[in-house]
Amino acid sequence: MAISQSLRNRAVVVEKFITLAATAGTNVGVSVPAGTLVLAAGIETMSAVPDVSVYTADVTDGSTIFANDVSLDAAAKNTIRAGVTPGFVAAADTIDVVTTITGSPGAIPVRVWAVIIDVNGCVVPAAEVDRDTLA
């Protein structure tokens, strides 16, 4: 018997709206469960970012940097920056934004997103029943 497509794990987009602090540091992003493959991750600015000397961000779970040194300096509202470095998250974790800032951009609202697949087993094979052995 074929496995129904609706029973299989699928890629989904998870997101969280956060406000990046006005100074360099780590901002907690989306939560992902154990056994998750991250295919891509990134940031979307919800307002314009001022032009300062340096404003870069890493989207990371602490082990894998999914989007490395994406520039947010002078980014327009709704600018999407992404990285496509895949990574496996073995234990439940968060995908955070680590910023490097030189200047004073102020607090910046953003949407942190990731395309993920839960790769834990999702389907259990059917057990044999009497009708399968009668005939």
How does the language model describe each region?
Residues M1-A135:
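Surface-exposed, low-hydrophobicity beta-strand/loop segments enriched in small/polar/acidic residues
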